[in-house]
Amino acid sequence: MNETQIQRETRQVVEDVLEKTNLKQGALFVLGLSSSEVLGGHIGKESSQEIGELIVETILDILGSRGIHLAVQGCEHVNRALVVERQVAEQFGLEIVSVHPTLHAGGSGQLAAFKFMQDPVEVEFIKAHAGLDIGDTAIGMHVKHVQVPIRPILREIGHAHVTALASRPKLIGGARAHYPQDAIRKT
């Protein structure tokens, strides 16, 4: 698998999702990543630290330039806990938990986040504004209600299936209520 191609595809997809979700500075963005799937393997079976680092570093660069915070979801072996900057955990009132990821418990994306973030910690839950799922890792539990599927410009990064979620406020009030237009809500 060509690392330049994976980096280019990651950049294309993330920039496209950010454009479609219109995330603002200070927003939370969750990443679910299976490096095994990117390489054409089965999720959790052929993890690659190099691919995890390539993808996470690329995404951190894109999000950081926009002031958007990254949360990297781990696998079920760490109860899908997430790596965030300590400052983000404190700002959003997130409960820090005690676990340090490994390649096969947390995964390559979490290890990369621990490498590239300034003061990484693990938290149990978040409510992100949007997210990207590379390799069918199931990020929905960490995206705010109401979740709206986003179709990325590419359907795959490497060999991994790619999906994305945005969120919008709940519509309340009933038949007489009026709702503001937003780019996320489908009409």
From Swiss-Prot:
Sequence intervals crossing the membrane: none
Signal peptide: none
Superkingdom field: Bacteria
InterPro entries, alphabetized: Antibiotic_NAT-like, DUF436
Family: Belongs to the UPF0340 family.
UniProt xrefs under NCBIfam families: TIGR01440 family protein
Protein name according to UniProt: UPF0340 protein SPN23F05980
Organism: Streptococcus pneumoniae (strain ATCC 700669 / Spain 23F-1)
Lineage start: Bacteria, Bacillati, Bacillota, Bacilli, Lactobacillales
